[in-house]
Amino acid sequence: MKKTLLATAIVGALGASAAAQAATVYDQDGTKLDVYGRIAMGVAGGGPEYDSNGNFQDNGEEFVDVFSRLGFRMSQEVTSDLTAFGRLEWRFTGDENDTDGGFNEIRQSYIGLQSKQYGTFQAGNFDSFYNQFVSLPFDVYIDRGLEFAGHRKQSRGDSIGYYTPDLQGFTAFLQLKHYSVRGESAPNAEGTVIAPQGGVRYQQGPFTVG
């Protein structure tokens, strides 16, 4: 496993944090559009390693991209309590002149409805609610493989989810990901599968448990 020696975010007008450093492009009559992103690069090394087949690899130092991204957030107030929203985010290779696959992943693409009274429902391609409510507050280094095992199995594409409004510090969430065999010439033995995920998070000031 490569050891990350240095990971320095190079911050422009869009800022380093997608959540806190979004730039508002349009905000009028209940309609809002934000753009956000980051260019993050580091230096990785670690000497001799072995691949999954046990073959020797001499891994010297190199510049690496550390999850650079660019995205948009959209929202429209439907009523005083109901807001429709959407998000679209790409990952790109920030450390190379990659003209063919620079934007190499659609990381987020979803739409939803948010109510202060009834909670939030969304559908599409998004991070697991476990990751959003439990893992992220603890700043887990997912590039080192330290993440909930079901993150991609229960989210990221063909997913729907719901989480409650804040209930005196408690937030409950439920998420479902649909696996379909539609169009496959040789369906797998499991057939169509729905992978569920749920939990409860309690947060009070800097204290979080979930």
What are the residue ranges of the model-derived segments?
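Gram-negative bacterial Sec-dependent N-terminal signal peptides
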Residues: M1-A23
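Residues in and immediately flanking transmembrane alpha helices
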Residues: G15-A16, T93, G210
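Cytochrome P450 core scaffold surrounding the K-helix E-X-X-R motif
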Residues: G46-Y50
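Conserved acidic, metal-coordinating active-site core of Asp-based
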Residues: A186, V193, Q197-G210
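Outer membrane beta-barrel
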Residues: T24-G45, Q57-H178, T192, R201-G205
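Short, well-ordered secondary-structure micro-motifs
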Residues: V134, E184-A186
